[in-house]
Amino acid sequence: MSERGNRKTQIGVVVSDKMDKTVVVKVDRLIKHSVYNKYIKRSAKYKAHDVDNSCKTGDRVLIVETRPMSKDKRWKVRQIIERNA
């Protein structure tokens, strides 16, 4: 994989698994407000390809950037870090 370049990775929580071979992953990040110097939580939702339909809602997953697979899907689930109990 190193010869193709570094791909972006994100860690997030699965919020929806209702689509076939697709999950919606919510990724949280902290940004610092420029005026008030307070940290604010921002989140983004990404649609990710799940080949085996193995991810369930609440799972913590690692997603990696990949080629566009559809209009909205540009990420792929690499591994499930933590299962939802």
Curated annotation (Swiss-Prot):
InterPro entries noted in UniProt: NA-bd_OB-fold, Ribosomal_uS17, Ribosomal_uS17_bact/chlr
GO process annotations (BP): translation
Domain of life: Bacteria
Coiled coil: none
Keyword Ribonucleoprotein: yes
UniProt GO cellular component terms: cytosolic small ribosomal subunit
Keyword Protease applies: no
Keywords: Ribonucleoprotein, Ribosomal protein, RNA-binding, rRNA-binding
Example GO molecular function: rRNA binding
Gene3D superfamilies, per database record: Nucleic acid-binding proteins
Family: Belongs to the universal ribosomal protein uS17 family.
Function field: One of the primary rRNA binding proteins, it binds specifically to the 5'-end of 16S ribosomal RNA.
Self-association and partners: Part of the 30S ribosomal subunit.
NCBIfam families in the record: PRK05610.1 (NF004123), uS17_bact (TIGR03635)
Name of the protein in its database record: Small ribosomal subunit protein uS17
Gene (UniProt): rpsQ
